[in-house]
Every structure is written in structure tokens, then in C-alpha cells.
């Protein structure tokens, strides 16, 4: 399947690469199918690209690359929705707001994206009782 993307133009993807958000993403409830693409070969950043809207591509990354102490408990309801059987099948990503320099780039740690890589079901989870916010500066020194 060939899709149009925000950052890479036309890209060929396989059906098994498609990630399904059954309820969409907050603010984009009609966008239910995405694919994860590398931003570039050397970059730790990825693109969560909508299959339906070429202009909708979020820059994402593993939070653990920049925030060593990042942790939260995944609600049992989310585990059931995503049909998680093994914690090793779960991938956690956070949406980044890219700025002019990496030192000014922020991560939304309040609303991580959880992907079950076994069945490709995903959900953006809002951590209500959390010390995390929507704009945490990346801890660049710890990732270098």
C-alpha cells in the first residue's frame, strides 16, 4: 500500500505495519489508522503518521531515551482494550513538540501512546493522577 506522508512524501507500507486506534487520538477522533516511520536514519525520533490524512504526522519518541525515571501504571481497562498478554509486547511513545533546537523540544509525558506490537492496537492514555505534564523539556544530556 502506498500512502502520502507529511515528512516523506509517498511511502510504501505493509498492512502489518498499520496501528489501529479504535477510538482515534484525543483531538483527532476520526483518525484511527496510523503507521510509525523513522524521521531519518540517524534520528531517535519517529513519525506517527495518519493513513487517512497526509498532513497529520506526530513526531514521537520513546520517553525512556530522554527520561530514565519515567514510569506509570497502566490501567487494567487499557490492558483489556489493547488485549495485552505480555508486557514485552507493549511499546510506549510520547508526542514531542519540536522547537528550533533540541534543548527547547518538549515531550508530552502526561499522555503517552501505548502500542501492543503483537496485535497493533494502540491508545493514547491520559495520566490523570500524575506529576507529569504535557511539556517536559527533553533531558538531552542523559541521552547523549
UniProtKB/Swiss-Prot annotation:
Keyword Transcription attached: no
Keyword ATP-binding: no
Main location: cytoplasm
GO cellular component, one term: cytoplasm
Compartments reported by the entry: Cytoplasm
Keywords for the protein's UniProt record, in alphabetical order: Bacterial flagellum biogenesis, Chaperone, Cytoplasm, Translation regulation
Protein's name in the database: Flagellar assembly factor FliW
Organism, as annotated: Bacillus pumilus (strain SAFR-032)
Gene: fliW
Amino acid at each position: 500500500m502506498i500512502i502520502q506522508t507529511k515528512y516523506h512524501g509517498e511511502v510504501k507500507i505493509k498492512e502489518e505495519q498499520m496501528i489501529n486506534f479504535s477510538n482515534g487520538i484525543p483531538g483527532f477522533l476520526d483518525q484511527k489508522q496510523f503507521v510509525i516511520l523513522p524521521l531519518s536514519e540517524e534520528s531517535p525520533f519517529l513519525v506517527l503518521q495518519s493513513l487517512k490524512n497526509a498532513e497529520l504526522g506526530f513526531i514521537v519518541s520513546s520517553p525512556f531515551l530522554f527520561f530514565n525515571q519515567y514510569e506509570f501504571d497502566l490501567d487494567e481497562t487499557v490492558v483489556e482494550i489493547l488485549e495485552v498478554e505480555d508486557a514485552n509486547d507493549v511499546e510506549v511513545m510520547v508526542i514531542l513538540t519540536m522547537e528550533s533546537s533540541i534543548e527547547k523540544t518538549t515531550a508530552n509525558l502526561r499522555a503517552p501512546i501505548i502500542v501492543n506490537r503483537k496485535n497493533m492496537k494502540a491508545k493514547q492514555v491520559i495520566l490523570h493522577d500524575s506529576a507529569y505534564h504535557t511539556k517536559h523539556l527533553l533531558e538531552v544530556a542523559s541521552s547523549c
